[in-house]
């Protein structure tokens, strides 16, 4: 059997799609849509999000975004609400940090929305770590 001497398949030839530097127009919500913040990634194209109307919903990432747009926890997203299921929604768009800040400045997002802050441990200072001094280190070194 011959050795594989190639450098990859068709995806290598296509190259990366570098379109993050382009500014896109800010998309506001319409009726039947709501802003939300991702709480938890569930896998299989699903996530749990807290919509800014106060309802926690199970959201499904649509196929257009599925492998192209990476969604993480605490991201601000735009979801389309379902008429027949109130506790489920579909992810329409992911806002980057600059867009989310401008949405907050326009008053579209509430003031308590945390943008680009991944504080998973909750409120508290990280600097206040207490260590116990069990003994003098000099004595331990001399005994050896």
Swiss-Prot record:
<dbReference type="InterPro" id="IPR018104">
    <property type="entry name" value="TIF_eIF-1A_CS"/>
</dbReference>
<dbReference type="InterPro" id="IPR001253">
    <property type="entry name" value="TIF_eIF-1A"/>
</dbReference>
<feature type="region of interest" description="Disordered">
    <location>
        <begin position="114"/>
        <end position="144"/>
    </location>
</feature>
<dbReference type="Pfam" id="PF01176">
    <property type="entry name" value="eIF-1a"/>
</dbReference>
<keyword id="KW-0396">Initiation factor</keyword>
<keyword id="KW-0832">Ubl conjugation</keyword>
<comment type="similarity">
    <text>Belongs to the eIF-1A family.</text>
</comment>
<feature type="region of interest" description="Disordered">
    <location>
        <begin position="1"/>
        <end position="26"/>
    </location>
</feature>
<keyword id="KW-0648">Protein biosynthesis</keyword>
<comment type="function">
    <text>Component of the 43S pre-initiation complex (43S PIC), which binds to the mRNA cap-proximal region, scans mRNA 5'-untranslated region, and locates the initiation codon. This protein enhances formation of the cap-proximal complex. Together with EIF1, facilitates scanning, start codon recognition, promotion of the assembly of 48S complex at the initiation codon (43S PIC becomes 48S PIC after the start codon is reached), and dissociation of aberrant complexes.</text>
</comment>
<feature type="compositionally biased region" description="Acidic residues">
    <location>
        <begin position="124"/>
        <end position="144"/>
    </location>
</feature>
<feature type="domain" description="S1-like">
    <location>
        <begin position="22"/>
        <end position="96"/>
    </location>
</feature>
<feature type="cross-link" description="Glycyl lysine isopeptide (Lys-Gly) (interchain with G-Cter in ubiquitin)">
    <location>
        <position position="88"/>
    </location>
</feature>
<dbReference type="GO" id="GO:0003743">
    <property type="term" value="F:translation initiation factor activity"/>
</dbReference>
<feature type="compositionally biased region" description="Basic and acidic residues">
    <location>
        <begin position="16"/>
        <end position="26"/>
    </location>
</feature>
<dbReference type="InterPro" id="IPR006196">
    <property type="entry name" value="RNA-binding_domain_S1_IF1"/>
</dbReference>
<protein>
    <recommendedName>
        <fullName>Eukaryotic translation initiation factor 1A, Y-chromosomal</fullName>
    </recommendedName>
</protein>
<keyword id="KW-1017">Isopeptide bond</keyword>
<comment type="subunit">
    <text>Component of the 43S pre-initiation complex (43S PIC), which is composed of the 40S ribosomal subunit, EIF1, eIF1A (EIF1AX), eIF3 complex, EIF5 and eIF2-GTP-initiator tRNA complex (eIF2 ternary complex). Interacts with EIF5; this interaction contributes to the maintenance of EIF1 within the open 43S PIC. Interacts through its C-terminal domain (CTD) with the CTD of EIF5B; from the location of the start codon by the 43S complex until the formation of the 80S complex.</text>
</comment>
<feature type="compositionally biased region" description="Basic residues">
    <location>
        <begin position="1"/>
        <end position="15"/>
    </location>
</feature>
<dbReference type="GO" id="GO:0006413">
    <property type="term" value="P:translational initiation"/>
</dbReference>
<dbReference type="GO" id="GO:0000049">
    <property type="term" value="F:tRNA binding"/>
</dbReference>
<dbReference type="GO" id="GO:0005737">
    <property type="term" value="C:cytoplasm"/>
</dbReference>
<keyword id="KW-0694">RNA-binding</keyword>
<keyword id="KW-0820">tRNA-binding</keyword>
<keyword id="KW-0963">Cytoplasm</keyword>
<dbReference type="InterPro" id="IPR012340">
    <property type="entry name" value="NA-bd_OB-fold"/>
</dbReference>
């Amino acid at each position: 059997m011959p050795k594989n001497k190639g450098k990859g398949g068709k995806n290598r030839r296509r190259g990366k799609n570098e379109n993050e530097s382009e500014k896109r127009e800010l998309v506001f919500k319409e009726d039947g849509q709501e802003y939300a913040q991702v709480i938890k990634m569930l896998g299989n194209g699903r996530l749990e999000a807290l919509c800014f109307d106060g309802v926690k919903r199970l959201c499904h990432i649509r196929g257009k975004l599925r492998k192209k747009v990476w969604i993480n926890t605490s991201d601000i997203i735009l979801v389309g609400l379902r008429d027949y299921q109130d506790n489920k929604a579909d992810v329409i768009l992911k806002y980057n940090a600059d867009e989310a800040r401008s949405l907050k400045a326009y008053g579209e997002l509430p003031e308590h929305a945390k943008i680009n802050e991944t504080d998973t441990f909750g409120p508290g200072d990280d600097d206040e770590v207490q260590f116990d001094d069990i003994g003098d280190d000099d004595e331990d070194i001399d005994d050896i």
